[in-house]
Amino acid sequence: MIEHFISDPHNVKFVESIFNKKLFSSISTDYPLVIISDSHVAEKILPPVLGFIDSLGYRVILLTFPPGEKNKTWEIFISLQNQLVDHGVSLGATIMGIGGGIVLDMAGFLASTYCRGIQLFLIPTTMTAMIDASIGGKNGINLRGLKNRLGTFYPPKDVWVCPEFLTTLSKQEWCYGISESIKHGCVADAYIWEFLHSYGDTLFSSRTILNEFIKRNCQIKAVIAAKDPKDKNLRKILNFGHTIAHALETLSEGHIPHGLAVSVGMMIEIKISLESGIMKNPSLVEQLYNLSNNFNLPTTLEELRDLIPQHFLHRFYHPENIITTLGYDKKNLSNKALRMVMIEHLGRVAPCSGSYCATPKMGILYEVLKSECDAVRNN
């Protein structure tokens, strides 16, 4: 089964199996097919996939890099670019990213910059990558530890979403992606919020429910990205929870997984929305807490403590460190005017005169963060 269910801002197909030669019909066998992945995916998932692609007559070039956020760097990027040159890859080639969000970010940035742009296909293998990272054409790498400081907008020619890959993941890894879905519910689609409340763990055991869930989330992301492909206004609502999350990831030097950082980031940012008077319904904070807890997602910085190396822990003792790191967020117009997404009510972000980002009062930001940091320092 191949279901072409999204065409804007780019094609997305929902497939039962990657082992279908019809999927590859638009990729010429006259030029190399370059697979970008990480070493973990290459070992656990790729062998049968590579065997199938090879049987179709492609000259396959596999380029991998070590897994993890700490390896989404300029140095790895340049190394991969050099390997493309060493293999004689030219404009007619296709780059295919197979993996989670980090792999897809790297593959997209490589494809957009090599020869000023070569054909790109994406095959996400994690929940986060399926419902978020693979949709919309954003890519990027970190620079000096700062999240996605370098990147482009480069839509793939096609994305193939195959839920079968999720069987290779632990339940915890599935839940990393659930945080992005909760975000979709908060900023744009209250139906997703109700869906998660209603089905809960059934999501992990029913393929029918899972398929509906994945498609709905992909469609939400696609609709928003199509309306604002270059992330100038409306698309910024998808950064809810990510302003704080990226600061936490930076300070931990990649040791806090993105999905867990986003979960905590959403709780902190929704509290800031409430304290700022933008969100009027305090019960939404409790609802977010309960929904996150249903999927074993953290809601406080203290819950992330065990993931942070001991020699980095002091960075989370004082709110000033987080606030300083927030100054480097790419949404900011300057490092003195911090901006983040504020929730007005469930399914709606405060429009803020069309920017969809607000600058919280420093006193409110400080006090909310201080409460989080005090818990880390004192426990």
Curated annotation (Swiss-Prot):
GO terms for cellular component: cytoplasm. It is an enzyme of class 4 (lyase). Signal peptide: none annotated. GO terms for biological process: amino acid biosynthetic process; aromatic amino acid family biosynthetic process; chorismate biosynthetic process. Its EC number is 4.2.3.4. Its cofactor is NAD(+); Co(2+); Zn(2+). GO terms for molecular function: 3-dehydroquinate synthase activity; metal ion binding; nucleotide binding. It is found in: Cytoplasm. NAD(+) binds at residues 67-72, 101-105, 125-126, 138, 147. It catalyses: 7-phospho-2-dehydro-3-deoxy-D-arabino-heptonate = 3-dehydroquinate + phosphate. Pathway: Metabolic intermediate biosynthesis; chorismate biosynthesis; chorismate from D-erythrose 4-phosphate and phosphoenolpyruvate: step 2/7. The keyword Signal does not apply. Keywords: Amino-acid biosynthesis, Aromatic amino acid biosynthesis, Cobalt, Cytoplasm, Lyase, Metal-binding, NAD, Nucleotide-binding, Zinc. CDD domains: DHQS (cd08195). Catalyzes the conversion of 3-deoxy-D-arabino-heptulosonate 7-phosphate (DAHP) to dehydroquinate (DHQ). Belongs to the sugar phosphate cyclases superfamily. Dehydroquinate synthase family. This is 3-dehydroquinate synthase. It comes from Chlamydia felis (strain Fe/C-56) (Chlamydophila felis).
